[in-house]
Each structure stands twice: as structure tokens, then as C-alpha cells.
């Protein structure tokens, strides 16, 4: 059997009558049947009369004018090419072919009919239903279920990619096979109900079929629960190789429950929309294809993967345990204890010597009206932490997704220190209630490094956090988290953008020099850094360092301008944190002292790389300066020593930690991208 090809909503259809015979037809409630009395008439017929059952509403339509027909059959109408009948019924039949319409044909003056045509009708109700109004419940026959619209008044059902693993002994995500092992797995799916009502059995030659298009078959899967009362079996009926499924008509009032899962996220070649159809098919004769006489369609949008900005409350902090980071680990633990989140340590057997947990993964989430759960995006970087997301994170209600390039080379810019997201912003009247994704790229026309296209396409295709490309290729490592971060302002809905600034550093050092602290020493008490005494005077008198940092400030300002434009920020939204960089052999920047902007943000508690700046009156003047900027906003600054375990390997606190946060309370389907 071929699945039906026509997918339009067949709400009106034509039935052909023939004088001297009776035609049987199935009528679906909510549709209209048209029949042409003129072409069905015998030769010599000039007028016709009508008789019909109480349950059928019959109208004679001539030249666009409709006239309702009483049941007694006394009235006559002149036959003309424009004479048609419009039939409808309001209730499902209790028996097959129990409702009738009879057309009697007459000659000019004759009182007895010369012939007649009969139509025997069976009325049934068919409705494929989903949660189109997004309240978590499947409603009945929502008129907008076949389309999908954004916004607070929007309609259309939502589907989750079933990318978690509810069965611990399976190697991959639940959506990777066609089996269901538990009720928990069904809870990740969206419900769909096929409602039918009618006589105990349909007339011979009719069947009901559920089907999907070939292009949707790798994006959606449908399951049916067999024997709900005698130990359930979950049968996979649609998706992958299965394009259609014949539904057994049970008679009376019936509701068949199906479970629908998403198989893949929106991407460059997939908008995220999938449709499922039910058709009533009519059989004519052996060897002739079945024809659809009624189709009902529902549409789902697959929920996008959503990133969580720093302003959202933290749930868990992840950090790697290394041979050399015991003190760092202890300081992070102390910081986390001040907040209400948990510390999760990735031990050496799992990290295999890879400390950069920020670079391997990005935490996000997916959500539908009935359910939501966190989903980790695995970077194509694939360092020694590459098994961590699948082995330690993927599990019940914790999903996994990745994008790997086939032919492109993976660079440092594909690490997820180079993937951040802003808090919610409004730009020129356009709202971004979930913020905007920020990724680092190369300078236009420079032919430098860029994040791989498959990841950029994936982020763009999610639609709800329109990405902004920044310029990060001027840095040796090339990550956006090396020059910017966002902090919440406690108790307010506001935030600030923190940016690394070499000019702020030079300005601070000149002020200290002017106040007589030119001999203040940096990196005090650190044996391994350098045998040279590095003072404010030495830094300010180093011409090449000054020139390099003027260039780096231009790179920072280029990004500042993009961020101001794309996030609608003003200067008062930005706080400059002093930073210094030195140029490597490729003319790219690496931090001269621990880069304070590369911090971990846990509500009001900030874990900031300890800069080991010049000691003025027994205090680091950089720490004092930063406290003076941030503490008046209600933030608490904790400076963490990362110099030997992270800074010397070209990363800081943010690079070595990762935070899973609570999802937005705002529902993504309420926005208009």
C-alpha cells in the first residue's frame, strides 16, 4: 500500500451520483459533500425532487444561492447545469449507511419520477489532536493545530528531541533507537491523540492511515502503547524507515494515544517544523491506489537548544581535579559553599589530564509545555575530556548533542570558552528575551581562524538567541571569555558588561606612579614567575609593551563597538577591568598577569583570577581597584590563585570551570524571533 500523496486539508469533496443506482459514501464531520444532480440525470429529465433522512442537512445551490431542503420531497426544482447539492451532517452515525438522500427525476409535466439516484451516508468523526495551545494538555480539534506561530498568542505543538538516556545501560541517547524501555522515556515525548466516533464498523473499502513525509522521517518518531491494561508494549509505528501506519478502526467513541519524539535539533537544512497526518482512504478496486477522502494534519516545532547567561542562578559548578591544582580546587570549593549550588569534581580517571572543562562543553536546556531538561552541547574540540559529557552527564533527564565538522579543521576557536550568551536585551525595538549568543571569529578579510561552520549553523538555526560574531583571533587562544563577561546586579533586573581594558590598566598604573608608588612590585611572593623584579615603572617605561597594548586596546574597542551596537549597550552599561597582554611570535595576545575578566559568576559571588598586581601599602592595587568598581553594585569579589595551575597554560578561572544554570522562566515560544 502506498501512503497518500495529497497532504492538503480535504474539507470539501465531490461525490458523483448515477441515476438508477445507489452510491455509498463516508462523510467526515466538519466537512461538506457536493454532488451534481444535473450530470447524474437520465435523458429527458427536466425537474427533480429530494428526500433525505433527518440527520442530513441538504441545500440546493443554484448560481451561488443556497436554499435548504425540507425532508418531505414535495418541492421540485428545474434541472440546470448550475444545480448542485451541498450536504452536511452534525452527528456521527450509529450504523453504517443508515442516512439516505434520494433524488427523483421527472419529465416536464409528469407526476411519477422517471428514475432516481440514491446516496447512502455513514457519518464519522476523525480528529488528530495535540497540545496546540501549549498548556500541557491535548485539547480537542484545535482549529490552529496544522500550523505554528510564535509569540504569547501563538499556537502549535512543541516536541523535545529525546536526547537524554533514561535507560542507564544503553550506549547512546534515547532517540538513537526505535525502542522504549520505560515510562520515563515516554514522559520526554509529546502526546498525540487520534479521536474517532462512528458505527461499530465502517463500510467495506475504507481505512485510516497515519503518515509522515519522507523529509520528516529522520526527524520524528511515533510510538503506540499496545495493551494498556495487560502489561504495556511500546510499538514504534512511524519514523526512519516507517512512513505510514494503518490504524485499526474500533467503532463507537475511541481515543488512541500516541507518543511523539523529536530525533534531531533544528539545523541549517531543517527549520524545526514537522507534520503528522491522518487520512481516511477509500478503496475502489484491486490494483487501483487508495484515494484520500479526508486528511487531518498536526504540526510540531522541535524545541531549540537554549544557552543560559551568567545572570541566571547557578545549579552546579564543574571543575577538574589535577595533579597540580589542589589549592585552586580548595578555593573554588570555598567559593561554591557561599552559594546554594553544588560542586561537581571531574576526577583524573575521567579528565585524563585535561583541565579545560569550559572548552569541552556548553550547558543549555530544552523545554516544552509538559517538560524540560538540561542538554549539554559537546564541542568538536575533543580533548582528553571528550568522554566526560557522554559518560558523566548524559542520563535520565540530561540530554546530549554535538556537531562535528566533516572536512574543516578544528581550531582553538571551536572550544566553548569561545561561546557565550548575553543577558536579555532589546535592540532598536527588537526584543531578545533569551539574550544573544556571542562567538569569537577572525577579523574580516584576514583569513584567520573562525568557529567551524557546522557549529555556527547549529547555533543560528535555534532561532531564539540570534548569534553575534565578535573578533577574538587577535588572542593566542582566541576565546571571547578572555576579554568579556556579564555580571548580574543583585536585586535588579540589570546587568553590566565587563571588558578587559589595557588603557584602564595603564591609567591606573600612571596614577599609582604619580602618587609615588612607581617601585611597587608585581608577582610578589611568586618564585617561579620570573627572577626579574617587575615594577610599575618598568612596565610604563617599556615602549614595545606599551605599543603592543595600544594595538590590543584597538582590538578590544572593535569588539566594544560591536557589542554596543548588537546588544544596544551604552558606556554606562560597561565596566572596564584592567588587563595587560604581551605579544607572542604570531603577533597574538596572551595575558601578562592573570586576566580578571575570565571569572566565574555565581549570582552575587564572583571568583576572579588573582592578578598579583603591584603591591601598594601591602595590598594589590588591581584587586583594590576592581573591588571599588564591583562591590558598590552589591557583588562579592573572591580572588582565586590560578597562576601556576591555569594562567601559565594560557587560561584562567573561567576556562577551568563550568556552570550549569537554571533555565529562563520566560518560555521561548512566547518570543518572536
UniProtKB/Swiss-Prot annotation:
Report any Pfam family annotated for this entry.
Answer: PAD_N
Compartmental location: Cytoplasm
Gene3D superfamilies in the record: L-arginine/glycine Amidinotransferase, Chain A, Protein-arginine deiminase, central domain, Protein-arginine deiminase, N-terminal domain
At the top level, the lineage of the source is Eukaryota
Tell me how the cofactor is bound.
Binding of Ca(2+) triggers a conformation change that is essential for catalytic activity.
Q: Which cysteines are joined by disulfide bonds?
A: none
> Per its record, what are the GO molecular function terms?
calcium ion binding; histone H3R26 arginine deiminase activity; nuclear estrogen receptor binding; protein homodimerization activity; protein-arginine deiminase activity
Keywords from the named record? Acetylation, Calcium, Citrullination, Cytoplasm, Hydrolase, Metal-binding
EC number(s) stated in the UniProt entry for this protein: 3.5.3.15
Q: Which residues bind Ca(2+) 4?
A: 174, 177, 179
Where on this chain does Ca(2+) 2 bind?
A: 162, 164, 166, 174, 185, 188
Binding locations of Ca(2+) 5: 362, 416, 419-420
Q: InterPro entries this protein is in?
A: Cupredoxin, PAD, PAD_C, PAD_central_sf, PAD_N, PAD_N_sf, Prot_Arg_deaminase_cen_dom
Chain sites annotated for binding Ca(2+) 1 = 131, 133, 135, 139
Q: Which residues form the active site?
A: 655
Annotated catalysed reactions: L-arginyl-[protein] + H2O = L-citrullyl-[protein] + NH4(+)
Q: Which cofactor does it need?
A: Ca(2+)
Free-text tissue specificity from the UniProt record: Expressed in various tissues including muscle, uterus, spinal cord, salivary gland and pancreas.
Q: Name one GO biological process term.
A: estrogen receptor signaling pathway
Q: Which residues are modified to Citrulline?
A: 352
Which residues carry the post-translational modification N-acetylmethionine, per the record? Answer: 1
Subunit? Homodimer.
Which protein, by its recorded name, is this?
Protein-arginine deiminase type-2
Please name the taxonomic classification of the source.
Eukaryota, Metazoa, Chordata, Craniata, Vertebrata
